UniProtKB/Swiss-Prot annotation:
Gene3D superfamilies: Homing endonucleases (3.10.28.10). It comes from Acetivibrio thermocellus (strain ATCC 27405 / DSM 1237 / JCM 9322 / NBRC 103400 / NCIMB 10682 / NRRL B-4536 / VPI 7372) (Clostridium thermocellum). GO terms for biological process: cell division; regulation of sporulation. Keywords: Cell cycle, Cell division, DNA-binding. This is Probable cell division protein WhiA. Belongs to the WhiA family. Residues 276-309 bind DNA.
Length: 314
């Protein structure tokens, strides 16, 4: 089961009062409902979902709120033949007009979605509307791979409505157009966690938080390993360069021409090419700190560079 399906199944177990049920139903019908004007006397509304729990929830809400038994049928998905889709149909002969009036959808020659200001009055109403919107038309990526949550709307006005509701909780949503639809989305993990909390998906929230913590730990470990690897590579490269320069000095100048302190560190570096600066310093008599060792080795680098310049090798 996908993470998105698990979230929806959890949301379908959230208990709601009559008002919250109405706002859930309103969101589902407004955002993903397909309204068809058959003729002057007949209108129908279709809700299509692949989630069986959501289909049962919508069917129950319609019956509890309006005493209507909606028609429900099961089909194979036209896109993915192995998937089942559930189709809930309401008609004007079975009380659809009353529902449309309650959820601010006006049907005459065309379908008009009137701004649904009622759901802005209380926080619980806004939560219920967002829960219904996600159940009807939302999806979420696998958080192991990336953080992305979206709700698809079939017009800009509805997308703006959903975005404004999200932003009333300071979620910083964005809207984009995709294949003729308008998608409201969240990209930040923290905002997605907050959204799941708002709509009541608390188990999914905890799972997402655990995934975020593990990903952050892995990223921190990788950063440390990469940093240590880079530092080790720098140390190795410096040691190789130092050994090459010291051998060049030995061959073209001779150690006897070097001051005692440089001769000592040159021999020590050749003898212990894989030693760190700290280890080299501790082997000297008297011991020398890292900066002192580094200073002497840099002097040897400069001597080698001068010799190469004199011989025209640079």
């Amino acid at each position: 089961m996908s993470f998105s399906s698990a979230v929806k199944n959890e949301l379908c177990r959230v208990e709601t009062d009559r008002s919250s049920s109405l706002f859930e139903l309103a969101a589902a019908a407004r955002i993903s409902g397909l309204i068809k004007v058959v003729n002057a006397n007949e209108i129908n509304l279709r809700l299509v979902t692949e989630n069986a729990a959501f289909a049962r929830r919508i069917f129950s809400q319609i019956k509890d709120l309006y005493g209507i038994n909606a028609e429900i049928s099961i089909r194979r998905s036209p896109k993915l033949k192995k998937n089942i889709v559930y189709i809930i149909v309401l008609t004007s002969s079975k009380g659809l007009m009353r529902i449309l009036e309650d959820i601010n959808i006006k049907v005459s020659e065309k379908v008009e979605y009137i701004p649904y200001a009622r759901c802005m009055r209380k926080k619980e109403y806004r939560k219920a509307y967002l829960r219904g919107a996600f159940l009807a038309s939302g999806s979420m990526s696998d958080p192991e791979k990336t953080y992305h949550l979206e709700i698809t709307c079939h017009n800009m006005a509805l997308a703006t409505e959903v975005s404004d509701l999200m932003d009333s909780f300071k979620l910083h949503s964005k809207v984009t157009k995709r294949k003729g639809n308008y998608v409201v989305y969240l990209k930040e993990g923290e905002n997605i966690v907050d959204f799941l909390n708002i709509i009541g998906a608390h188990s999914a929230l905890l799972e997402l938080e655990n995934i975020r913590i593990l990903k952050e730990m892995r990223n921190n470990v990788n950063r440390i390993v990469n940093c240590e690897t880079a530092n080790l590579q720098k140390t190795v490269d410096a040691s190789v360069r130092q050994v090459e320069n010291i051998n060049y000095i030995k061959e073209h100048l001779g150690f006897d021409k070097l001051p005692e302190n440089l001769r000592e560190i040159a021999k020590m570096r050749l003898a212990y090419s894989d030693a760190t600066l700290k280890e080299l310093g501790e082997m000297l008599n008297p011991p020398l700190g890292k900066s002192g060792v580094n200073h002497r080795l840099r002097k040897l680098d400069k001597i080698a560079e001068s010799l190469r310049n004199m011989k025209g090798e640079l």
